[in-house]
A protein has these predicted regions:
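N-terminal Rossmann NAD(P)H-binding glycine-rich loop of SDR-like oxidoreductase domains
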Residues: 22-36
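Rossmann-fold cofactor-recognition segment
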Residues: 47-61
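Conserved Rossmann-fold cofactor-binding substructure of NAD(P)-dependent oxidoreductases
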Residues: 57-73
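Conserved mid-core alpha-helix of short-chain dehydrogenase/reductase
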Residues: 62, 105-113
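Conserved NAD(P)H cofactor-binding loop of Rossmann-fold oxidoreductase domains
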Residues: 77-86
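Substrate-binding pocket helix/loop in short-chain dehydrogenase/reductase
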Residues: 87-88, 95-97
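Catalytic loop of short-chain dehydrogenase/reductase
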Residues: 99, 106-109, 123-149, 153-158, ...
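C-terminal helical subdomain
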Residues: 161-164, 168-216
Length: 216
């Protein structure tokens, strides 16, 4: 009986094998997500300037070309996006546009295009961050962008069709990034990228939509 049960589980897992595009696969979180999902699914690794598949998420035409190349997928994961850090008194519209153009609109570009290239029941997982709820000095751009992304996901979830889901992962500062960003995050508990990657697994391999998965 146990043997038959195990065979059933193996068969079920094989049937759940998905084709997943990971945008930002060469970054710290992206690599951890690929490592977390690759044992169970077929992963398409997408970088910004390296690898077989590349995309400039700030350019909607580049995003469209990417999906023309990779075809239909079951899920997309975005761990990409740049932000600007600096004192409020020195912020200019040009500096503020860094986060708006890249992390915010770049990921929204991905979602808007991906909805038409996902198989029925597919999923979209984006990335925001703890600063949406816990602002820090010199982090106005990051707080604005992350909060907007959380809002976009909650709103988009009620309009997506064909059973497509959308969620977002909101991580704290990474342990791997403390050397560069640690002084901005005194008092924050850092998390390893491997732990953050579990939240992406929950989104991709789960059933919920409109969720903000906080890793903090």
């Amino acid at each position: 009986m146990r043997s038959n049960h195990n065979q059933f589980l193996i068969s079920l897992i094989k049937e759940c094998n998905m084709k997943i595009a990971v945008i930002g696969a060469t970054g710290t979180v992206g690599k951890a997500v690929v490592q977390q999902l690759a044992a169970r699914h077929d992963i398409i690794e997408v970088g910004n300037s390296s690898g077989r598949y590349q995309v400039d998420i700030t350019d909607i035409h580049s995003v469209e070309r990417l999906f023309e190349q990779i075809g239909k997928v079951d899920a997309i994961v975005s761990t990409a996006g740049k932000l600007h850090f600096g004192p409020l008194q020195e912020l200019t519209p040009e500096k503020f546009q860094v986060g708006l153009r890249d992390k915010l609109m770049g990921q929204i570009n991905l979602a808007l295009v991906a909805q038409h290239h996902l198989n029925d029941g597919g999923s979209i997982t984006l990335t925001s961050g703890i600063l949406s709820h816990e602002p820090i000095l010199q982090g106005v751009n990051a707080t604005t962008v992350n909060a907007a992304l959380d809002g976009f996901v909650r709103a988009a979830a009620i309009e997506l069709e064909r059973g497509i889901r959308i969620n977002i992962v909101s991580p704290t500062v990474l342990q791997e990034s403390l050397a560069s960003y640690g002084p901005f995050f005194y008092g924050f508990e850092a998390a390893p990228a491997s732990r953050v990657a579990l939240a992406y697994s929950r989104s991709v391999e789960g059933a919920q939509s409109g969720q903000v998965y906080r890793v903090w």
